[in-house]
Design a protein with these regions (language model features):
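Cationic, histidine-enriched alpha-helical/coil surfaces that engage anionic ligands
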Residues: 1-347
Length: 347
């Protein structure tokens, strides 16, 4: 499907215009500044152990939305300014997300090891909301290979998490981040629209984002993904290349394009923004599962390449890697089932 090339001059009465985009970006920039203030206030741990993590998630969430708006509606903005701001937002969002990603990956792999061993799962390393106490069955110890694999993964990912934490602290105190915060503060009060963009229609830009998503989905092997247990995700499982699987790339790209499409729908159209499509939300959830499983499989494979590990440890890591690739396959199947579903109009 050929992408649409919107014309800023095209607009019709009653449709969302560049003025609505300016209000949307200003609101998202204000959310970014509010999250930044919250992150600074919770940095001393006064709000609990999970306070800084919640603030970092809020900061990343607002950064993603500002960045998505600058990308989708770039033609209505100062292009050089939009590109520079997007690059800086991507930097800060990626830097802040590394620590959480390492912790979540470790939790995922340890839970999978215990599940594959038929034992009681270990407690998560990521803080969870308090729940009522439950009676758990007695823990069964892991086998030697699984226990050593768990210890190896814990060492590697805990070290990576510590480095990511230090990197985030360094980034937040850097002149580069302060310059970005100043730029977002200006955006909260004055959105740099292109000349004549205040009255331009946003519809063609949002439609172009949807077209990019549709084209990327059409290139996916959805027919294969729609067959359970097709084992496509396990292809090249013994490749000596430690890099992520090339077959995962198009799925990751669809995940990003789906997020851009969902965020574009949040920009007010007329009186109010449309309600979130549950089909898009479910598809995004499936692609998040795909990303998490693919990255966990890479972590298991990299750990298995550690020099001088015992055969039992390497075997446990190999089983763990295959398990996560099966999770990749299951996520692709879930996405295919969700995407092929059509919303039935209400009667």
């Amino acid at each position: 499907m050929a992408p649409r090339h919107p014309d800023p001059a095209d607009s019709e009465p009653g449709e969302a215009t560049g003025a609505a985009l300016a209000a949307h970006l200003s609101a998202r920039a204000t959310e970014f500044l509010r999250a930044l203030r919250l992150h600074r206030e919770t940095g001393n741990g006064a709000s609990g152990a999970d306070g800084p993590a919640k603030a970092a998630r809020a900061l990343r969430r607002s950064a993603r939305r500002v960045s998505a708006g600058l990308y989708t509606f770039r033609g209505l903005l100062d292009p050089d300014w939009a590109d520079e701001t997007r690059a800086e937002l991507a930097w800060v969002s990626g830097t802040l997300g590394l620590e959480h990603a390492c912790a979540a990956r470790l939790d995922r792999l340890l839970l999978a090891l215990h599940r594959l061993s038929g034992t009681t799962a270990a407690p998560p390393t990521v803080p969870a909301p308090a729940k009522a106490p439950t009676t758990a069955p007695p823990a069964v110890p892991l086998t030697i290979g699984a226990a050593r694999a768990a210890a190896l993964l814990d060492r590697r990912l805990t070290l990576a998490r510590a480095r990511a934490h230090s990197g985030a602290l360094e980034a937040l105190s850097s002149a580069r981040f302060h310059a970005l915060a100043d730029r977002i503060a200006v955006l909260a009060g004055d959105v740099p629209l292109a000349p004549g963009a205040a009255g331009a229609d946003l519809g063609p830009y949002a439609a172009a984002a949807e077209d990019r998503l549709s084209s990327a989905v059409a290139a996916l092997p959805l027919v294969t993904a729609g067959h359970p247990y097709n084992a496509q995700a396990l292809a090249d499982g013994l490749s000596p290349d430690p890099a992520p699987r090339p077959q995962d790339g198009p799925w990751h790209q669809v995940r990003l394009l789906l997020r851009l499409h969902r965020y574009a729908r949040e920009v007010p159209c007329g009186a109010a923004a449309p309600a979130e499509d549950p089909r898009l939300r479910a598809a995004g959830h499936a692609l998040n599962r795909h990303r998490d499983a693919a990255e966990a499989a890479v972590a298991a494979a990299q750990a298995a390449r550690t020099a001088r590990i015992a055969p039992a440890t390497a075997y446990a890591l190999g089983v763990l890697h295959a398990d996560q690739r099966h999770e990749v396959e299951a996520a692709r199947f879930a996405f295919q089932q969700t995407w092929q579903r059509r919303t039935v109009p209400a009667r």
